Amino acid sequence: MTRLRFLISRAMRQEAPVAALSVSRLKLLADLNERNVALVGNARSLSEKALGTEIDAADIIVRINRAPMPSAVSHGTRTDWLALATSLSDDDLERIKPHRILWMSHKRKRLSWNIANSEGFYLHPLEDYERLKQQLGSPPTTGAMMIDLLSQSGLGRLTLYGFDFFASLSLTGSRTADQVPHDFSAEKRFVEDLMARDQRISLT
C-alpha cells in the first residue's frame, strides 16, 4: 500500500485496507508462546519501587503509550512492544525504540503512516475494543486492552507492573480519575477476576 492510499483509507474510515497492514492476531499471539511477559503501566507508584532489573529480565517487555521511564532502577530500560492509543512524536519513538508497535485505539485517524508501515505492526480489531467496552461499561484503557489481549495467548507468565488503577495517577499527566473517560473500579475488578481464573497472571 502507498502512503497516499493509506491516508485516503484512513480518512474515509475504510477499515480493511488499513487492517491489511497488520500482522494477524494469530501471528502476534504465537510470538508470546511460553514467554515471560512484563506489561508496564504508567502509574506514578512504580517510580517508588526498584523493579527495573526484574522488568528487564522478562522475555518480552510491553509498555504503554508514552512509556515513561524516569529511572532504570524503577522501570528498566528495554521496550519490545509498544501499545499505543495516542500519537507519538518521532523523538518519543526514538527514545522508546520499540521492536513492534500495536495500535490499540479505535480512533484510526490518529494512526500515522510511519507506524502503520513499521515492521511487525498490529492493529487491534474494533470488535475487540467494543467487546471490552461493553464488559467494563466504559471505554477501556490501553492497559486493560493489553491485559485482555495478552491473556488470550499461550504465554508462560504475565506480570503487571505500574498498575494501581489510577490510585497514584499517571506519570504522563496530571488528570484525576474524574477527568478521564475510564472506570478504574471496573478495570480493577476485571483484572482481579482474570487473575483468579488464570494463575499465569500476577500484579506486582
Model-inferred region functions:
Residues 1-204:
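Metal-ion/cofactor- or nucleotide/acyl-coenzyme-handling active-site neighborhoods
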